[in-house]
Amino acid sequence: MVLVVDYGSQYSRLITRRIRENEVYSEVVFPDDKVDLSKVDAVILSGGPRSVYEEDAPKLPEWFQEYKGPVLAICYGMQLIVKELGGEVRRGRGEYGRTLVELSRDPIFEGIPEKVHVWMSHGDEVVRLPEGFHPIAVSETGVIAAATDGKRFWLLQFHPEVHHTEYGDRMISNFLFNVCKLEKNWKIGDLVEEKIRHIKETIGNKKAILALSGGVDSSVAAVLVHRAIGKNLVCVFVDHGLLRKNEREEVERVFKEHFDMNLVVVDARKRFLEKLRGVTDPEKKRKIIGEEFIRVFEEEAKKHDVEFLVQGTIYSDVIESAASGKTTAKIKSHHNVGGLPEKMNLKLVEPLRDLFKDEVRKVGKYLGIPDRIINRHPFPGPGLAVRVLGEVTEEKLEILREADYIFIETLRKHDYYDKVWQAFAVLLPIKSVGVKGDARAYEYVVALRAVNSVEGMTADWSRIPHDILDEAARRITREVKGVGRVVYDITSKPPATIEWE
């Protein structure tokens, strides 16, 4: 097993995912967790938002002194090893984003060109290596980008786990097989069976209620839990009035065709919109929706004598809500995580909590879920409430539904929907001047957003052909009453998040 020590990096679970892609089992622990070293073949120390010289900065685990195997230390992990072994780290100019580095010959860089672009995210830098270490990569600004003692420590200042690092997957696989001499012995089926066993042990003969949206996350969670407890699972679809066009009807149709499950549809449109009246702050909107969601489920659970609530929370939700560890920096709360009310009368089960979106899709395919569900674009739990910037009203929701529908329909028409990871429209809280007919118009602005990603932790804006964007913009301004201008968002993640709120 490869143990990943999480120092609060947004990418810690991504390291685990890269390892699992190589069919090697991996788990994540925190620095103060107890560990059975007899099961550990290699250790990876993650990055983190702290400085090693801060008074309360996370330290090496207590068990690390006893561990004698290979270590890959990334970003903060590299600086921690350097400091602990007598080297020097100090505040630098910082390197962020895509950076060119020059590599030296080393087993971890086997099969990789001498110069590659990597993903940096650090303010501190190593200025002196510990005795016995030598640099094996230097950045274009002269900063030590990687080092090793040639025995058991390999240190990388950049993040090989993110897709923006060229040959990052190869570096991780080189560490696993060239350095650690591990063997491939873990499959996605092992993960599925392990999760089904865990769900059976957790829920037993009790009943569970599942928050079904019809998206890939909740659908995979539903099938997993159904495999474990059968008819003791009640799937509840809540129409909170924040859905896309025709979404409720589509979900009902699909699940009646493909799944032999108890499906209950709750019409809660009025109560959600009433709660959101006058609210403009995005965090408040998310919290309100999360709390109201749980109230709906608690009411429904009482009708079915249910003790457990199942949610399709995935790991990118957890990370952005800073629920993965005390050193992680919070980005925003998700209604499946930070939006939950503190006093919940149901026991929470989140079978996908440690998986990224692409892993969830692989699990879904393994379980035999139809491609039209598996390949559906991600949709936030709070729905269109976080795509209507500012106060949510029926009028704004209807405008956004139509604009979003046209954008997606246009992408499908040109066979482009499956070429982007996520695409949607956002209604901005501003109006702009325009001309319709021979008259002055003063109408809303719609932003179109499309990104390419693998796991949702990083994303690049999609280079959709101009003629497709032009067609979508023309249709929206022509067919959607109240919209006079369409813009296209060309911001990547980071610095932006994928959703606007």
Swiss-Prot record:
Keywords: ATP-binding, Glutamine amidotransferase, GMP biosynthesis, Ligase, Nucleotide-binding, Purine biosynthesis. Its EC number is 6.3.5.2. SUPFAM superfamilies: Adenine nucleotide alpha hydrolases-like, Class I glutamine amidotransferase-like, GMP synthetase C-terminal dimerisation domain. GO terms for biological process: GMP biosynthetic process. Residues 1-185 form the Glutamine amidotransferase type-1 domain. InterPro entries: Arginosuc_syn_N, Class_I_gatase-like, GATASE, GMP_synth_C, GMP_synth_GATase, GMP_synthase, GMPS_ATP_PPase_dom, Rossmann-like_a/b/a_fold. It catalyses: XMP + L-glutamine + ATP + H2O = GMP + L-glutamate + AMP + diphosphate + 2 H(+). Coiled coil: none annotated. GO terms for molecular function: ATP binding; GMP synthase activity. Residues 186-376 form the GMPS ATP-PPase domain. The keyword Electron transport does not apply. CDD domains: GATase1_GMP_Synthase, GMP_synthase_C. ATP binds at S213, G214, G215, V216, D217, S218, S219. Pathway: Purine metabolism; GMP biosynthesis; GMP from XMP (L-Gln route): step 1/1. GO terms for cellular component: cytosol. Catalyzes the synthesis of GMP from XMP. This is GMP synthase [glutamine-hydrolyzing]. It comes from Thermotoga maritima (strain ATCC 43589 / DSM 3109 / JCM 10099 / NBRC 100826 / MSB8). The lineage of its organism: Bacteria, Thermotogati, Thermotogota, Thermotogae, Thermotogales.
